[in-house]
Swiss-Prot record:
Annotated KRAB domain residues: 4-75
Major localization class: nucleus
The entry's keywords: DNA-binding, Metal-binding, Nucleus, Repeat, Repressor, Transcription, Transcription regulation, Zinc, Zinc-finger
Tissue: Expressed in bone marrow and in monocytic and immature erythroid cell lines.
Protein name per Swiss-Prot or TrEMBL: Zinc finger protein 253
Amino acid sequence: MGPLQFRDVAIEFSLEEWHCLDTAQRNLYRDVMLENYRNLVFLGIVVSKPDLVTCLEQGKKPLTMERHEMIAKPPVMSSHFAQDLWPENIQNSFQIGMLRRYEECRHDNLQLKKGCKSVGEHKVHKGGYNGLNQCLTTTQKEIFQCDKYGKVFHKFSNSNTYKTRHTGINLFKCIICGKAFKRSSTLTTHKKIHTGEKPYRCEECGKAFNQSANLTTHKRIHTGEKPYRCEECGKAFKQSSNLTTHKKIHTGEKPYKCEECGKAFNRSTDLTTHKIVHTGEKPYKCEECGKAFKHPSHVTTHKKIHTRGKPYNCEECGKSFKHCSNLTIHKRIHTGEKPYKCEECGKAFHLSSHLTTHKILHTGEKPYRCRECGKAFNHSTTLFSHEKIHTGEKPYKCDECGKTFTWPSILSKHKRTHTGEKPYKCEECGKSFTASSTLTTHKRIHTGEKPYKCEECGKAFNWSSDLNKHKKIHIERKPYIVKNVTDLLNVPPLLISIR
């Protein structure tokens, strides 16, 4: 046998057979023939380009043989192969044409055995064929029968797709990284990662992508289109994957479980982030100062310390913030939005932390105790503020007048006395105030709300100061008995002022 040629691994059609093929079959044929040619070139077997390959590359009909020559050459089939598979199970011209060329490989090349379901099971004895088999991850000569459906498949009539579906094997492998895929088209797309090719460009902003699907998804940023809608709550998304993730909120599904502690998550990315808690790993490092963080978002937040920038501006009042979340919270001052509501009394708050703090009022819990005097408080911030009474610390200084304060928020309010700024406006009467708390108190004039109630007689008041004045009536009638030092430390201020 002579050296392996392209003709040995090529399939040729008559005009009649070619016209019997549909578009998908023609495209498949073209892809496989060109792939065969490239493999032979890779092995150094083919030097000159065959006419068939030229026709296929130019999109022409691949009719390299004369019509009468093709008609005069009926398929020469092995007797056993013909008995098992021909003509009952092979009904279309596509399969017939494919089989013709392989049957032309005579018995000195392929030793067919009776009852064998795969020509690929027989060893190819000639060196040229062995070289080709080593190059091709999938034997291009393989013709096999599926016992499950009783149909004959061939590589060129989607046998690879068929085998992948039934075996789960990824047939198309990337030479660069070794990753395997079920479809050649997926492999072609994947290769662009290595080449850096991004042929799909957004006309709106110029951003380029590897895949057309990614460009389609990207365009929705400009159009605002959200085609994927949740049937449960009506929320819409730009990507189907985001909708899939969102649905787990309704189903409660948490398929991603931490092997270390058993905690489960909706998304694999959340699990990956969580695992850092156990490892203590801090893979995200600030290039400016070298400080490391567990999450990339923390690095982004940290970097603003170096730039000192405040990129997030309030359109309403012009105030700037370092973080987008702080701007979102700030906007609630202007909108009056209070999304966090107490189930006990119905009071609503701007921040979830304020609601958490408020709930302690209902429980009466005072977990924060001063080490200096033993006084207990509902909140850690109140304790921290109280401790400054003992230390006398006032670290926040006004540049205008030199006055110092225990808290930065109090300093901010104080500064407005110099600037005259009154950002908090009453929608009811138009009156403006320097502090949001003053506006809240003022609104009670319009609403008639009296949240401060005397525990002794049940009388209610608009302001806490009025309640304190009222309490003196009851205190004057009752002596305050001091039994120990702790009671002395906790003498009500109102009683001290009366005595």
